[in-house]
Amino acid sequence: MSGNARAIRVGEQMREELAQLLRDEVKDPRIGFVSIVKVEVSRDIRHAKIYVSVLGNDQQKKETMAGLASATGFLRSELAKRLQLRYMPELHFALDESIEHGQRIAQLLVQVREEEKRSEREEGE
């Protein structure tokens, strides 16, 4: 279990460092409003799946993911300088749309509540 705890700890460190690198160091104009949602590191610390949330339309998301793919080498080398690891995991970026799904559900719930209020008012008349 200690290997799993270590992978979680490394993932959290990577999330913090990647967020700072994307904010301060990466100058690719394709990379817009990106949030690092979660980093899952394999037990052997060889692979890291980085879940990102991107603000924008589908085209902007595609461009951002392409920008992240092209910046992977730079990000990996910068992480190697900042984190004291024997092996630097390979970085794999994945789009996380759970925030958008949550916003859509919240929007639908608001619409349902408004319709319920409207129907209650109509019944009362």
Swiss-Prot record:
GO biological process: maturation of SSU-rRNA
Signal peptide residue numbers: none
GO cellular component, one term: cytosol
GTP-binding among keywords: no
Main localization (coarse): cytoplasm
InterPro entries membership: KH_dom-like_a/b, RbfA, RbfA_dom_sf, Ribosome-bd_factorA_CS
Keywords: Cytoplasm, Ribosome biogenesis
Single GO term (MF): ribosomal small subunit binding
Pfam family, one: RBFA
Subcellular location: Cytoplasm
Keyword Cytoplasm appears in the UniProt entry: yes
Its job: One of several proteins that assist in the late maturation steps of the functional core of the 30S ribosomal subunit. Associates with free 30S ribosomal subunits (but not with 30S subunits that are part of 70S ribosomes or polysomes). Required for efficient processing of 16S rRNA. May interact with the 5'-terminal helix region of 16S rRNA.
HAMAP family per UniProt: RbfA (MF_00003)
Subunit organization: Monomer. Binds 30S ribosomal subunits, but not 50S ribosomal subunits or 70S ribosomes.
Family: Belongs to the RbfA family.
Protein name: Ribosome-binding factor A
Species: Symbiobacterium thermophilum (strain DSM 24528 / JCM 14929 / IAM 14863 / T)
